Amino acid sequence: MSAKGKTGRKKASKGTSNSAKAGLQFPVGRIGRYLKKGKYAKRVGAGAPVYLAAVLEYLCAEILELAGNAARDNKKSRITPRHIQLAVRNDEELNKFLAGVTFASGGVLPNIHNVLLPKKSQLKAGTANQDY
């Protein structure tokens, strides 16, 4: 009795994705497909989707970290568009990068114009020295 057909054959293993090879969470294959489909250039290099996925992942991680800090400052456990707006607008580089972007349900930054604030000299002398 011989083990027919069982010698030398290895079990078929699942292939690893390009994202896993690059150590990324963002889909390298999908980004590559979008680059080809979008007709941005005649040809797309093998490293271009990997690089773009890494850049997008870094930007998302940066924004989510700052938005998480904003949510924690407001004693909330869920990140809302308001927290993302506060995070982006309070960071100088992200604000410059996303200057033309409007966040839905983001609100506005809290800001009171200096002219509308009471003067400090009036606060000290105003209550003690009133002439009728």
Curated annotation (Swiss-Prot):
Keywords: Chromosome, DNA-binding, Nucleosome core, Nucleus. Residues 1-13 have a biased composition (Basic residues). This is Histone H2A. One of its GO terms (cellular component) is nucleus. Its main location: nucleus. SMART domains: H2A (SM00414). Belongs to the histone H2A family. It holds the Pfam family Histone. GO terms for molecular function: DNA binding; protein heterodimerization activity; structural constituent of chromatin. It is found in: Nucleus; Chromosome. It comes from the Eukaryota. Core component of nucleosome. Nucleosomes wrap and compact DNA into chromatin, limiting DNA accessibility to the cellular machineries which require DNA as a template. Histones thereby play a central role in transcription regulation, DNA repair, DNA replication and chromosomal stability. DNA accessibility is regulated via a complex set of post-translational modifications of histones, also called histone code, and nucleosome remodeling. Residues 1-21 are annotated as: Disordered. The nucleosome is a histone octamer containing two molecules each of H2A, H2B, H3 and H4 assembled in one H3-H4 heterotetramer and two H2A-H2B heterodimers. The octamer wraps approximately 147 bp of DNA. CDD domains: HFD_H2A. InterPro entries: Histone-fold (IPR009072), Histone_H2A (IPR002119), Histone_H2A/H2B/H3 (IPR007125), Histone_H2A_C (IPR032454), Histone_H2A_CS (IPR032458).
